[in-house]
Amino acid sequence: MSKTHLTEQKFSDFALHPQVVEALEKKRFYNCTPIQALALPLTLAGRDVAGQAQTGTGKTMAFLTSTFHYLLSHPAIDDRKVNQPRALIMAPTRELAVQIHADAEPLAQATGLKLGLAYGGDGYDKQLKVLESGVDILIGTTGRLIDYAKQNHINLGAIQVVVLDEADRMYDLGFIKDIRWLFRRMPPAAQRLNMLFSATLSYRVRELAFEQMNNAEYVEVEPEQKTGHRIKEELFYPSNEEKMRLLQTLIEEEWPDRAIIFANTKHRCEDIWGHLAADGHRVGLLTGDVAQKKRLRILDEFTRGDLDILVATDVAARGLHIPAVTHVFNYDLPDDCEDYVHRIGRTGRAGASGHSISLACEEYALNLPAIESYIGHSIPVSKYNPEALMNDLPKPLRLTRSRPGNGPRRAGAPRNRRRSG
């Protein structure tokens, strides 16, 4: 984490439980990010918090630190049963739930508190086996949580801490009824520590906070601009016929260490994957059609650096904490202005610099005015020389459902085709 992204406030300055401080320092977390510096004084005083901060600013560690401290500082309720977790962390996607669980593991190891993970798609019996042994902190998606609750595998009557992460995304995905169902099975809001974090604190998110929290304090960390000043933005206007060749030429020129390419449909993503895999790039595909185990494997390979490029729909645009993404390519300009911000927010995180390249083609250029109005500035336009685009490209691979992952990256130096402008 870049020092320029941190405040002067140290975790050790707070009256945090010593085991929590020890775990943080073991991970070399000494200074707070702005959202942590604002939220922790409130949660440590037992106040509910609804926090807004740009993605990549430390929201996850803010609520994990608060959760572990609270459970270590407060006894469990009397007669707590083995199927009653003490804290519940709700996330909108399986990938985000898995990432939160991974971020919580060092704290769990240091404190002895037990973690549970519950998400749909696969692993029902494996997840259930962990729950049956008893967990202190349960992290999951709403559908699987409700499933376990209806089967009496979990009981929410002993919940002391509740976290709702990416609350605006919960609304977007239609999970609000599930959230309310789960809240109704918990103790009253005044008997819990409640935390809500979101990229935006819209009216409907504030309404949810009013409804389910106990006089929540609102904390906001607003960037100077929605897209983050460390992200270099660039825009090209290709024709539909030149769009794929321009993307491949830009990848050869930029040769990104770790890039995410976003497209608006799964079929477009599959097409991009086919072109890049045929050209020898180490590329993975992440769409809703990819099986859950394979999704997690691809994300792990991308995070480890075994894959250099991830082609994704907006299922991956929110909540994923993938370090050191150097480039984001918007192959299609998104229909939703907020998705543009969330997409390019995959790079330039936690004080690092990043590069966002968008292609405004004939099909999606009409989305540009609304995007630029939303972010409050024009995206700098670059020109390219059509004659310099790559044209000696292999025939794209066609996706086989049994193996949508990757191909070996070509050895040797990248082609030297320069763009103009």
UniProtKB/Swiss-Prot annotation:
CDD domains attached to this UniProt entry: DEADc, SF2_C_DEAD
Keyword Protease: no
Domain Helicase C-terminal positions: 245-390
GO biological process, one term: RNA catabolic process
Residue ranges of domain Helicase ATP-binding in the record: 40-219
EC number: 3.6.4.13
Top-tier EC class: hydrolase
The name this protein goes by in its record: ATP-dependent RNA helicase RhlB
Species of origin: Salmonella dublin (strain CT_02021853)
Annotated gene: rhlB
